[in-house]
Amino acid sequence: GITLKEIKDIVDKYSSDHDRNDIKAVILTSPTYEGNVSDIKSIAEYLHQYNIPLIVDEAHGAHFNFSESFPQSAVKCGADIVINSVHKTLPSLTQTAIMHINYGIVDVERIRRYWNIYQSTSPSYILMSSIARSLSIVKNDGDKLFAEYVDKLTILSCLLYTSPSPR
């Protein structure tokens, strides 16, 4: 994942004479496809000192809120906008996603204005109900399902680390 030091270096590099107003937002992907998670809490706290919004593509982290075994969601860590692709890590149809907004730095009315311009006037109720069903499943059975999942990951990890090298 991206470290706070890397963010500080980038902000310094792209700010003219340390005028942080040159930077309109920082966009991160966390977790990455490979599962690397950035220190969102520290990064958000640093950026918020300069009124810089943090947008996190948390496509592969929609499950974070549903088990203590997973990292904290970027929403809870203070990111201003977080996008989850629900279908990637939860039982939902492909193309389903959710955008979360933490009020404070971002102009919510501006987002609504653009959202209304670009959203479909014919939303897919099948996709929306898939999100609702998915969230219902993890709300009602998430503890059990994710405990089983974590147990299987632990077993797999042990097997991979104790297997003899193929060479």
Task: Mark where each language-model region is.
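Conserved small/polar residues in nucleotide/adenosyl-binding loops
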Residues: 161-166
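Conserved PLP-enzyme active-site core in the AAT-like
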Residues: 1-160
